[in-house]
A protein has these predicted regions:
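Short acidic/glycine-enriched loop/turn segments that link adjacent beta-strands
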Residues: 27-29, 91-92
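Non-catalytic DNA-recognition/assembly elements of restriction-modification systems
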Residues: 1-16, 28, 32, 140-162
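Specificity-determining recognition surfaces
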Residues: 96, 114-143
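Short glycine-enriched loops at secondary-structure junctions
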Residues: 38-39, 78-79, 127
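A short beta-sheet element
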Residues: 34-35, 50-115, 134
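Sequence-specific dsDNA recognition surfaces
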Residues: 7-23, 36-68
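A short beta-turn/loop motif at secondary-structure boundaries
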Residues: 23-25, 88-89
């Protein structure tokens, strides 16, 4: 087992929101998640969102397309909702998403690992009215990672028990 900062094993990406004043940015074909979508998601993977955006909306916002298996973490209101992207999608700024370097960590393993770290993530978050987990705090958050074979073993066990 070896300790890593998240930034050493993942690319951390923040989300964004297109202007709500421009109708042509909304109701497109691109899944656009908010923490509310994860609050009602009872599965490990998420495939749909309440709201969608257009390609134009994506282009004119700080939202970025995330690949299948990106680890999605709500970073405010509340901190700690987790899911894996079941298809390409993007998120609002209430997320910090992680694209895993699979030479070090399997996305599904990181998903399970972070489920055990929600309290720690809340404890390091800042803010007076609403706590928020910044990109910098998440990037520097340390996790202990097993070798890939053991990670796969854990994932297999979790899949069988689900």
């Amino acid at each position: 087992m070896k300790e890593f900062k998240i930034k050493d094993i993942c690319e951390v990406i923040s989300g964004g929101t297109p202007s709500t004043k421009i109708n042509s940015y909304w109701n497109g074909d691109i899944i656009w998640l908010t923490p509310k979508d994860l609050s009602s998601n009872k599965n490990k993977r998420i495939y749909n969102s309440e709201e969608t955006i257009t390609e134009e909306g994506l282009t004119h916002s700080s939202a970025q397309m995330l690949p299948i298996n990106a680890v999605l973490l709500s970073s405010r209101a509340p901190i700690g909702y987790l899911a894996l992207a079941g298809k390409e999608l993007c998120t609002n700024q209430g997320f910090k998403s992680m694209i895993c370097n699979t030479d070090y960590v399997l996305p599904e393993y990181l998903y399970y690992l972070l489920q055990t770290k929600v309290e720690e993530l809340n404890n390091i978050s800042t803010g007076s009215t609403f706590k928020e987990l910044s990109g910098s705090l998440l990037k520097n958050f340390k996790v202990s990672i097993h070798d890939l074979d053991f990670q796969q073993h854990i994932v297999d066990i979790r899949r069988k028990s689900a």
